[in-house]
């Protein structure tokens, strides 16, 4: 989970405190969240820097690129490319490259803990000095992350930070250098020539 915690990055104005799926506040919150979510995971692509603090367990930072179903991330030890068909995970310490099908949950045994279905949450938004704070609370009987607090910029709607509760721990993610759009598809192509001396582990 430690090396793949970046994937939980973003799967993600009116100061009322009303929960539900049909209040003016919840509708506004959902619309705002959907816009930010599209800026991150839409076909135009995005790039950002992240700093993750998995409270009491782990800290890491890196850069990540998204474009539709494609992704790439770079940390100190782990690098990964997902071109929509094949997922390559590079361990620079062990000098290995592990291959999985892009959509396979097997590439990350913890991925089920971070499944995100927008319809499984109630939405709430409030205005703060730092930005708009959108809170997503898991509906009763649904599975997924229990609570998500997404802070977004009031003008651009770009993500600023995420606070995610899974089971009994919190993950805090600060986001910087966010850019939406102009992401070339070549970004997600695994540079095979750079890793000829590595051991390849094919789990497809």
Regions inferred by a protein language model and the residue ranges of each:
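Sec-dependent signal peptide recognition
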Residues: 2-10
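N-terminal leader/targeting segments and the immediate start of mature chains
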Residues: 12, 16-58, 65, 69, ...
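Non-transmembrane domains of secretory- and envelope-associated proteins
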Residues: 21-26, 128-130, 140-147, 155-204
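Short, solvent-exposed coil/turn segments at beta-strand boundaries
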Residues: 42, 64-72, 81-86, 128-129, ...
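Short beta-strand segments that buttress and anchor functional surface loops
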Residues: 49-53, 71-76, 133-141, 161-165
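Short, surface-exposed charged micro-motifs
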Residues: 61-63, 77-79, 122-124, 147-151
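An acidic-aromatic
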Residues: 63-108, 166, 171
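Surface-exposed, polar helix/loop patches in the mature regions of secreted/periplasmic/lumenal proteins
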Residues: 89-144
């Amino acid at each position: 989970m430690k090396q793949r915690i970046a994937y939980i990055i973003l799967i993600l104005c009116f100061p009322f405190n009303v929960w539900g799926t049909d209040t003016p506040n919840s509708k506004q919150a959902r619309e705002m969240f959907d816009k930010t979510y599209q800026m991150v995971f839409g076909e135009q692509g995005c790039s950002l820097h992240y700093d993750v603090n998995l409270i009491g367990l782990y800290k890491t930072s890196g850069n990540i690129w998204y474009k539709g179903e494609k992704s790439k991330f770079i940390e100190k030890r782990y690098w990964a490319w997902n071109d929509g068909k094949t997922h390559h995970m590079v361990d620079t310490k062990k000098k290995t490259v592990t291959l999985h099908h892009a959509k396979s949950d097997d590439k990350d045994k913890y991925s089920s803990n971070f499944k995100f279905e927008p319809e499984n949450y109630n939405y709430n938004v409030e205005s703060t000095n730092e930005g708009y704070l959108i809170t997503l609370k898991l509906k009763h009987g649904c599975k997924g992350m229990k609570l998500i607090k997404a802070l977004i910029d009031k003008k651009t709607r770009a993500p600023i930070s995420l606070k995610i509760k899974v089971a009994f721990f919190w993950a805090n993610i600060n986001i910087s250098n966010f850019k939406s759009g102009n992401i070339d598809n070549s970004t997600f192509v695994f540079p095979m020539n750079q890793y000829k001396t590595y051991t390849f582990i094919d789990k497809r």
